[in-house]
């Protein structure tokens, strides 16, 4: 799994040691597992996947002090939307009344996507990862609420994001696409660690 520690510097300041009580929750019907600090609330809803178009979705969420940890799984079956269209629209939605400070590739083993840091006009701050995988959009977000002191440790944000796993062992990239990423990232100690063609880690020689 890709390290995301360098993103945390743009998200929260130093804080106390990690809270106890985190547990992994597995959802085999949706091919993922993720850790939460408490039993997540699960809600059914809709998600706007394109302008004037919504799809069924599920939200798994926990609020702990001033941070909301959430996972959205939106159904893409039958939408005929490309990955770039899905991800670009998700970023557009996240950008409403907010500023995207960072937008770089993300990777969880062989599943590739995007990773963002977002600052809301209301003072909130979010760290988000987006993956279009097997006819679903997965959106994982840790959001620090506005006008409150950040009491959750950096390690909790890292723990949440790095706990996400796709449990069916699949990929959303062809072998050719993976080879292209590794070629761009050949300067890394292990080119397989590259997350995308525009991975900033791969541009540093």
What kind of region is each of these model predictions?
Residues 6-10:
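Hydrophobic helical h-region of N-terminal Sec-dependent signal peptides
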Residues 18-54, 100-110, 158-176:
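N-terminal "mature-domain start" segment
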């Amino acid at each position: 799994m890709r390290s995301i520690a360098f993103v945390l510097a743009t998200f929260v300041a130093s804080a106390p040691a990690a809270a106890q009580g985190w547990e992994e929750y597995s959802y085999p019907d949706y091919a993922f597992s993720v850790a939460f600090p408490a039993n997540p609330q699960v809600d059914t809803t809709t998600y706007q996947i394109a302008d004037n178009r919504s799809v069924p979705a599920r939200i798994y969420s926990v609020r702990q002090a001033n941070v909301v940890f959430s996972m959205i799984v939106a159904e893409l079956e039958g939408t005929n939307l490309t990955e770039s269209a899905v991800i670009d629209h998700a970023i557009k939605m996240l950008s409403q009344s907010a500023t995207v400070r960072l937008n770089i590739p993300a990777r969880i083993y062989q599943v590739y996507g995007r990773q963002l840091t977002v600052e809301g006009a209301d003072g909130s701050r979010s760290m988000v990862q987006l993956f279009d995988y097997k006819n679903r959009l997965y959106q994982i977000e840790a959001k620090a609420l506005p006008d409150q002191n950040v009491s959750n440790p950096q390690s909790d944000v890292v723990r949440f994001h790095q706990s996400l796993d796709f449990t069916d062992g699949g990929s959303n990239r062809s072998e050719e696409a993976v080879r292209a990423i590794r070629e761009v990232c050949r300067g890394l100690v292990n080119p397989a660690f590259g997350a995308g063609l525009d991975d900033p880690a791969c541009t540093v020689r």
